[in-house]
Amino acid sequence: MKLLLFTALVLVVISLIEVEAENERACIPLEKECTKTPGNCCSGLKCDCYRRFEQGVAKGVQCWCIEKDVTYKGV
């Protein structure tokens, strides 16, 4: 009986530690790169990706945290 209670207590403590660690994960602020972690922008922001070209040659994709309801157009 004591072993069962001890095991349950350990599981509860581990679960609480995991939840706390997830809540403390830092979000990515406005206009910072989110290419590797697209779901980690701060609240009110979205991760928007663009394909980058240099002299007509694709050089990869880059993503940035931007405001959700804002649309950017090329100049």
Swiss-Prot record:
It is found in: Secreted. Keywords: Disulfide bond, Secreted, Signal, Toxin. Contains 4 disulfide bonds. Residues 1-21 form the signal peptide. Its main location: secreted. Pfam families: Toxin_35. GO terms for molecular function: toxin activity. Residues 22-25 form a propeptide. It comes from the Eukaryota. Expressed by the venom gland. One of its GO terms (cellular component) is extracellular region. Belongs to the neurotoxin 19 (CSTX) family. 06 (U6-Lctx) subfamily. This is U6-lycotoxin-Ls1g.
